[in-house]
Regions:
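Short beta-strand/loop segment that forms part of the nucleotide-sugar
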Residues: 34-49, 70-75, 100
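Cell-envelope/extracellular polymer assembly enzymes that use nucleotide-activated donors
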Residues: 4-6, 42, 194
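Glycine-rich, basic loop-to-helix element that forms the pyrophosphate-binding segment
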Residues: 74-90
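Donor-binding/catalytic cores of nucleotide-activated saccharide
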Residues: 79, 83, 100-209, 216-232
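A conserved acidic beta->alpha catalytic loop
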Residues: 24, 47-57, 78, 99
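Short, well-formed alpha-helical segments that are part of the catalytic scaffolds
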Residues: 14-35
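Membrane-interface aromatic/basic loop that binds lipid-linked glycans or pyrophosphate carriers
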Residues: 280-353
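Short aromatic/hydrophobic "clamp" motif used to bind/position activated sugar donors
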Residues: 95
Length: 353
């Protein structure tokens, strides 16, 4: 049977988490229920030069499930290099990424595979719900997209809506990625922003299966979004943002219009995040990021994105357009900025209670 789904698992020093991740596919259960269904799944574990037993653990599962699990051992090259090497060897009709410290809802795996098979490749993008869990396994939040689930629908619905899809809730038709020559940046962090932005420009049709499929682990020590690590590596986020702008503007007519509208919206969201973090003092990023240099680069390289780069925060009942204010004054030390930071800190405090 041809592979319907390839799941790529980038793994660096993940011996503690990888067994739970791989067991979550319920491969024994799939074989008992429907042997052909197990054969529709391909799992590629990419060991990114780990110094622990990650490779050994992965090869143990490969020995148990040789028709499903494939292990690639490679020198360390960070997240994007794992995705790139897996893409070259993947055979599934659809492909998705699962971090080694995340895991599937085992009871949903078979249903999800059957859903993919039923599509016969009609959707370029397949969306699922996911939740965020802490180290104890307790769910902290659930992301339900609430999209139409009775039929494949056009990408325009997402382009016109407010949904911001994340890596935990998407699978792409692999042939689409091959056709566009998709390749992720290597040697840096935060390349998941590329995964849920650039391929979207090629999407014309979407399918949605409601129900939590993926459990996303948050709050683990050593994660790339951990405060101190994020602040120290924020320059990598700048590299990602520049690559997204260059690649998107470099192919102005490539892809369906609705796909490009959604991709543009996703890139704008990242740009706005950068300006917000710096100007409103989020996570201490302000001292580590040359926003003036980045803003000048954006103005010189993409006037369209530059002109659309506006964000505001409501102080009292009045919106404060802080990007415009900063560009006009070239300062973020005015009383309005002090009020904006206070308002943001209060909202963050209240949200955490």
């Amino acid at each position: 049977m041809d592979k319907e789904l390839t799941v790529v698992i980038p793994s660096y020093n993940m011996e503690r988490f990888l067994p739970k991740c791989l067991e979550s596919f319920g491969m024994d259960q799939l074989r008992k229920e429907d042997g052909t269904l197990a054969d529709a799944l391909e799992v590629i574990v990419v060991n990114d030069g780990s110094a622990d037993r990650t490779s050994e653990v992965a090869h143990q599962f490969e020995g148990r499930f040789p028709t499903v699990v494939k292990v690639i051992d490679k020198a360390n090259g960070n997240y994007g290099s794992c995705v790139n090497v897996a893409l070259r060897g993947a055979t599934g009709r659809y492909i998705r990424i699962l971090d080694a410290d995340d895991y599937f809802e085992t009871g949903e795996c078979a249903k999800y595979l059957r859903f993919l098979i039923s599509l016969h490749g009609a959707a370029d993008l397949v969306v699922n719900d996911y939740d965020e869990v802490g180290a104890s396994g307790r769910t902290s939040s659930v992301v339900r997209y609430g999209l139409p689930s009775d039929a494949v629908f056009p990408m325009g619905l997402l382009a016109d809506g407010n949904e911001m899809l994340d890596i935990h809730g998407i699978a792409y038709r692999r042939e689409m990625l091959v056709r566009m020559g998709y390749r992720q940046s290597e040697g840096i962090l935060y390349t998941d922003a590329e995964w849920h932005s650039l391929p979207m420009s090629q999407v014309a049709t979407v399918a949605y299966r409601p129900g939590v499929l993926t459990h996303y682990l948050v709050g683990r020590e050593g994660q790339s979004m951990e405060r101190d690590r994020f602040v120290g590596n924020v320059g990598m986020l700048e590299q990602i943002a520049k690559r997204l702008v260059r690649d998107f503007d470099g192919c102005p007519t490539s892809g369906p219009e609705d796909g490009r509208r959604y991709a543009r919206k996703r890139i704008l969201a990242l740009l706005r995040l950068i300006y917000t973090m710096v100007l409103l003092g989020y996570m201490g990023v302000r001292a580590k990021f040359d926003l003036l240099g980045f803003d000048t680069w954006l103005k010189n390289n993409s006037r369209t994105f530059y002109d659309e780069m506006e964000s505001s925060i409501v102080i009292g009942r009045c919106p404060f357009h802080y990007v415009t204010e900063w560009r006009r004054r070239r300062s973020d030390r005015t009383w309005r900025f002090r009020l904006a930071r206070l308002a943001l800190n209060m909202r963050t405090f209240l949200a955490a209670k």
